[in-house]
Amino acid sequence: MSKGSSTKKWLHEHTSDYYVIQANKLGYRSRASFKILEIQDKYQLFKPNMFVVDLGASPGGWSEQVIKYIGKNGKLIALDLLEMAPIAGVEFIQGDFSSDETYQKLNTLVNNQKIDCVISDMAPNLSGNKTSDQAKSIYLLELALDFANTNLNKNGSFVAKVFQGQGSDEYLKLVRESFNKVIQFKPKSSRAKSREFYVIATEFKG
C-alpha cells in the first residue's frame, strides 16, 4: 500500500470513528477525553482540591476533563512538546519533558508541593522503526515514573499510557515497586488494533 493510500485509509477510519464523532459532537478536544472519563468512572482517581500533573497533555483532552473533577480549588499543571490552547484553571508548559530546561520549569511550578496524581498520555514521535519507537516510549515512561516517585504524596496515584512490547513487562515491575496497587486497563475508547493500555497505579508507597 502506498503512503498516500495508507493516509487516506487512516483519515477514513479516523473520521468515521465513533469516539471522534462523539468528541466533535460534545465539543471535546480529542477522543482521548473518553479514555480519561472511563478511567475516572472505574477508579475514581480525581477529587475536589487535588493537585494533578498532566504529561503529554496536548491538545488537552485529559486536562479539560480532570479540571472539572478537581474544581477551582484544585491545581492542574499540563505539559507538552506541542502547543495547547488555554484551558481555564490549567497552567501549561510547552517543552520537551526529557530536557533539563523543561523539567526545571515544571519543578518551579510544582514549587515543592506534593502532587496527588501524575497522569501521562505521552508518546514519542513515531519513526516507523518499531524497536526504536518502543525504546523511546519506555524511556518517556521511565521519566514519568521518576517524576511521580519524586513528587507524589504518600498514597498518591499514577496513570500512564503503555504500549505492549519489549520492555513493557519490566516497566510494570518498576511501577509495582512504588505502588501497592497496579492494574492494567484498556479503555473501550482505545482503538481495537492499538497495542496501548493504561497502567493505573494507586497507593504510592512514598
UniProtKB/Swiss-Prot annotation:
Q: Which UniProt keywords apply?
A: Cytoplasm, Methyltransferase, rRNA processing, S-adenosyl-L-methionine, Transferase
Q: Which InterPro entries match?
A: RNA_methyltr_RlmE (IPR050082), RNA_MeTrfase_FtsJ_dom (IPR002877), rRNA-MeTfrase_E (IPR015507), SAM-dependent_MTases_sf (IPR029063)
Positions of the catalytic residues: K161 (proton acceptor)
Keyword Nuclease tagged: no
EC class name: transferase
| Gene3D superfamilies reported for this sequence | Vaccinia Virus protein VP39
The chemistry this enzyme catalyses reads: uridine(2552) in 23S rRNA + S-adenosyl-L-methionine = 2'-O-methyluridine(2552) in 23S rRNA + S-adenosyl-L-homocysteine + H(+)
Name of the protein in its database record: Ribosomal RNA large subunit methyltransferase E
Query: Which organism encodes this protein?
Result: Francisella tularensis subsp. holarctica (strain LVS)
Q: What is the lineage of its organism?
A: Bacteria, Pseudomonadati, Pseudomonadota, Gammaproteobacteria, Thiotrichales
